[in-house]
């Protein structure tokens, strides 16, 4: 919440691309390329999937600093619908979507703003196993597009399968940091947070 500006930082500094954004309001951070996807539903419930995405595109500007033309909006809309595999539900009203469909629509809306970083709050919460796999694949797509992804989630296994670097936070303090394989074998982390029964696959084997 401190990173996106929802609450004021009581210490330290927050940098984005080398710029101090600690005291900037949310909208300024968004203009700099920082997008936040909350755990709660963030779609416009009464709008269709395509209108949800279009609403964000209509606020964007092109390389010349001018609002996107109708042609540019339609081209980007079609591209996002294809990339997130939601062409088949484009005319569905958002309130009728499943958990996985809603997540994909929300991520498409986030991408419509051409972000540099996307913060995902509990992306694996409230969705079925198939949707979890789809979301992991979408996050990989974001990484391939060179978009930074910061995830906060209590689903440790799915998060470990997805991230390159992780922090384990306990009682407001960073308990440990490192790659998932290291953290899964960290005795302190297992004792305080993961539990002794926790297993995580490394090099094809369960620990």
Feature names for model-found ranges:
Residues 47-56:
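Short coil-to-helix segment of the ABC ATPase nucleotide-binding domain corresponding to the Q-loop/switch region
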Residues 12-19, 32:
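Conserved ABC transporter NBD signature motif
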Residues 118-122:
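Catalytic Walker B motif of ABC-type/P-loop ATPase nucleotide-binding domains
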Residues 114:
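Conserved catalytic motifs of ABC-family nucleotide-binding domains
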Residues 4:
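Helix-to-loop junction immediately C-terminal to a conserved catalytic motif
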Residues 68-89, 137-140:
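Conserved ABC ATPase "signature" region
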Residues 93-97, 101:
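Conserved ABC ATPase signature
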């Amino acid at each position: 919440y401190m990173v996106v500006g929802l609450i004021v930082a009581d210490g330290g500094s927050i940098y984005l691309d080398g710029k101090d954004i600690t005291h900037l309001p949310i909208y300024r951070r968004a203009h700099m390329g920082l997008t936040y996807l909350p755990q709660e539903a963030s779609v416009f419930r009464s709008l269709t999937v395509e209108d949800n995405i279009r609403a964000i595109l209509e606020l964007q500007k092109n390389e010349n600093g001018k609002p996107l033309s109708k042609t540019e909006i339609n081209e980007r809309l079609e591209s996002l619908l294809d990339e997130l595999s939601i062409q088949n539900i484009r005319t569905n009203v958002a309130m009728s979507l499943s958990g996985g469909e809603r997540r994909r629509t929300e991520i498409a809306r986030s991408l419509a703003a051409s972000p540099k970083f996307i913060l995902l709050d509990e992306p694996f919460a409230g969705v079925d196993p198939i949707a979890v796999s789809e979301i992991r694949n979408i996050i990989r797509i974001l990484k391939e597009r060179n978009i930074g992804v910061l995830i906060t989630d209590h689903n440790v296994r799915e998060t470990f399968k997805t991230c390159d670097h992780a922090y384990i936070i306990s009682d407001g303090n960073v308990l440990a940091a490192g790659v998932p394989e290291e953290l899964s074998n960290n005795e302190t982390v297992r004792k305080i947070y993961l539990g002794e029964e926790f297993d995580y696959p490394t090099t094809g084997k369960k620990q």
